[in-house]
Amino acid sequence: MRTLCGTILVAAGAAVAAAAPLAEYPGEVGEKTGWKCVGSEEGKVVYIPFEGYYESKGGRIESPRFKLDGEIGKNRFYRLTFSAKCPVDGYWWVDFFDAEGNQLPDVNSRLYASDDWTPYDVMVPAQPDAAFAQIAFVTKKGAQAKDVTMRRASVAEAAKWCNDLAATLPKLDAPETADAWAKLPKTRGKVLSGKRVNVVFLGDSIMNDTWCGNAVALIQSALPQADLRCFISVRGSTGCWYYHEKEHFDEYVAKYSPDLVLIGGISNRDKEQAVQEAEESMVETIERCKAIGAEVVVCTPPPSYEFRKDSSALPFDRALMKDGSQTFHLEQGYIRRAAARTGAALWDLTTAPCEAISRSGKPLDWFKRDAAHNDDRGKQLIAQTLAAYFGNGCSGLVR
């Protein structure tokens, strides 16, 4: 943990220009510095926006809400630095809000249990309509934080942060991306010509994690002439079984006037839903996208819940991806059939990161922040895989 949050990331921060901080709290934060403590009932199942129904993650201490800088309407990145200590694992957390105060999908990752002050240097992506933010620390046993600062970062800075982190992780085999854009001619044409492209990441909290790995920074760095506006649009534990209905589609997709929709996550089949029903609801969602002029990428499920029996370094068992396997969250036969039926592009976010995790021999929780969700390590494996499809597939602009 110290290598991840201390040496590697602090070293990456050494080259960063000292932008004026948007939020800065020297010393230990608390009620005297304007922060608020919010309690919780331990063990109670609660609805967490953009994540779903889970046992309460614990109480939180949260900053006052503050205004973001940068141009509204474009993706931005922010470097968050702090030191923290907590008796049990918890979460650092950033909530976002639009100009009217409506909550947008959050960014959060793991606080590692430690009796000593541990430095963190993390990168936080904000979507185009984000206008305000709030920082929080969440644990079941109480967390302490000090020297909290959040400042704007450039695309290059954010991409470097990603690549520095990736260099500390198990080797990730590049996915096959030669024909990644073959079914996306309109989007590719706009990317190559520098025209604005609205991209919607649609799914569940796992799709939110795909976003939170700062994949957009890697994509924008690989395609510097492109004018990409990337939006994350998610609902906890939700997939096409919900989004295929017109009122939900309009709320989560159509309002962004997308040129490209990425459908992903692990919730595109409700556990009570037959495989054929899941396939049909995905087909209908894709057809709705096409009807409003958007092209579609269907992403296979990235790693989430543990799929290994133990931490032995073994090859990834691809049988786990079959419909009806014991790893419900990785099944994708119906996903591949829906893409084939509709002519949507299919990008594999399963194989490369799952193979890297399988071969690593790392402990079962080394890539995760809780049972379902990845920490910055797991997120980065997914982000690098997704960025490879964008960059390598649209070779006309790759540096």
What label would you give each PLM region?
Residues M1-C5:
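Positively charged n-region of N-terminal signal peptides that target proteins for export
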Residues A18-A178, A182:
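Extracellular and organelle-lumenal recognition/adhesion modules and their flexible linkers in secreted
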Residues I232-G236, T300-P301, D348-T351:
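Residue-level recognition of beta-strand->loop/alpha-helix junctions
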Residues G264, C299-T300:
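Alpha/beta-hydrolase-fold catalytic nucleophile elbow
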Residues A291-E295, A344:
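A short helix->loop->beta-strand "cap" motif at the edges of active sites that frequently abuts
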Residues P303-R399:
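Catalytic His-Asp segment of secreted/periplasmic serine-dependent ester chemistry enzymes
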